[in-house]
Amino acid sequence: MHFDCDVLVAGSGAGGLAAAVAARKAGLEVAVAEKEPLFGGTTALSGGWLWIPNHPMQKEIGVADSMHDAATYLLHEAGEKYDAERVDAFLRAAPRMVEFFTRETAVQFDASATFPDYHPDAPGGRPGGRSIVARAFDGRDLGKKLTWLRAPLPELTVFGIMIGSGAELVHFMRWSKSFASALFVARRLLGHG
């Protein structure tokens, strides 16, 4: 098999597909190579949360952040493996990536003011606000292409339904304590399949 492309992306997880979308939006011919028979990479197994300090939605959810605090946190977490140049590049590019996808694609994100850093009490850590997740969508919109996607880990599902966004998770956790949540969960379960 021979083909020409401007950009060859290795892997179909979030990073690979994000690179492919960005390159295509820039007018380049893109090919994605995936070693597995299904798309999604390890992102499909992880639940899909992204750790993005200073993302554009932090103001909306009432969270203040700074590049300095995020870098301090990463220095504390990484120790000897801390690479200031890479950390700076990540902290500058990650919020722009969120803006790009929100503006240029159908991908939208939800932020959580209560989803903490792994070690929120560490220097520069936050009790919430840095993590975002792609907003849930109805997989049936993909038709037969849905079968091309790697299924999430069973531990991340309820009756085979991926509980993706923070808002959905809250409803599933509160189904027995809130009529609104019970109704939401019932609709989700009845609409599945």
Residue locations for each model-derived region?
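A short, basic/flexible loop-to-alpha-helix module at the beginning of a structural domain
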Residues: 1-4
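N-terminal Rossmann-like FAD-binding beta1-loop-alpha1 element of flavoenzymes
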Residues: 6-32
